[in-house]
Structure formats: structure tokens, C-alpha cells
């Protein structure tokens, strides 16, 4: 019985080591810009999230359905009053690590991580998931085996 338990522990330890190495490799590849991060929605959740990734050294693709938001982002600006977001956008643009796409499918094709940060507005106490569904449909067209999709929508309080 102890031998079986020892073999199980050895196998579990090997798996843990493999996972840690894999995660370390992901971090390295993100910081090198090999694995791009697409942030869908550059509003109250998406703009600060994109800025955090940019400050960490990642290459980020910003996507927003609003042309005004995209134009601002291409100038290194945002309408979100969060500290350091504009600075991160400007630095990312200068270092060619931040780009803004008009085409959400192209952003999906060009990225490894897809972060969905679109609003889920309440209508009659019901969430409206139309924006999420639209983004998911676009991502699906450009999705590749192994890609990671994270749903982090902004929701109203209450």
C-alpha cells in the first residue's frame, strides 16, 4: 500500500513540475510578445486590464465596437479615468506592443489569450448578453486549438 501511495505521489509531483514549467514558459512567451492578448472592450474593465498587461510587458490588441473608443486608443488615450492607463497605452504604442483592431475576428486569429470585457447591461432586471454573444461569435471564427478565452464582463451593481 505504501509503495502504491509513493508511486502516486511521484506521479503527482511530476505533473506539478510539468504544470509549473508550462506556466513559466507561458509567462516568458507573453513577456516576449510571442503570445498576444486580445482585450475585447476598452471600457471600465477592458482599458485598465489592457494597461496592466502592457505594463507587464505583454503585446496587447485592443478591440472595441465604438469607433470613437478605437480612435482614442490609437492615440494612446482612453475615456476611463483610471490612473496610468493612458501612459500604458502610449508606451505600448511607442514600443509596438499595443495595437487597436477594427476587426474582432482578425484579433482572435492574431492572439492567444482573448479577454472579453464587454458590458452586460440589465434590462428589466435581466442581463442582456447580446454584446457577449457577438464577441464570442467573432472569437470563435478566429479561435485556434489551445487558445484561452476569459469572460470578464462589466456588470451593473446590484
State what each model feature region is.
Residues 3-36, 59, 65-112, 120-126:
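Conserved N-terminal Rossmann-fold NAD(P) cofactor-binding segment
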Residues 48, 109, 158:
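Residues that form or flank phosphate/diphosphate-binding pockets in enzymes
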Residues 114-116, 151:
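Redox-cofactor binding/interface segments in oxidoreductases and associated redox assembly factors
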Residues 50, 54-55:
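Gly/Ala-rich phosphate-binding loop of Rossmann-like dinucleotide-binding domains
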Residues 38-41:
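Conserved N-terminal Rossmann-fold NAD(P)-binding element of oxidoreductases
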Residues 45:
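Hydrophobic/small residue at the entry helix of a nucleotide-binding pocket
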Residues 121-158:
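Rossmann-like NAD(P)(H) cofactor-binding subdomain of soluble oxidoreductases
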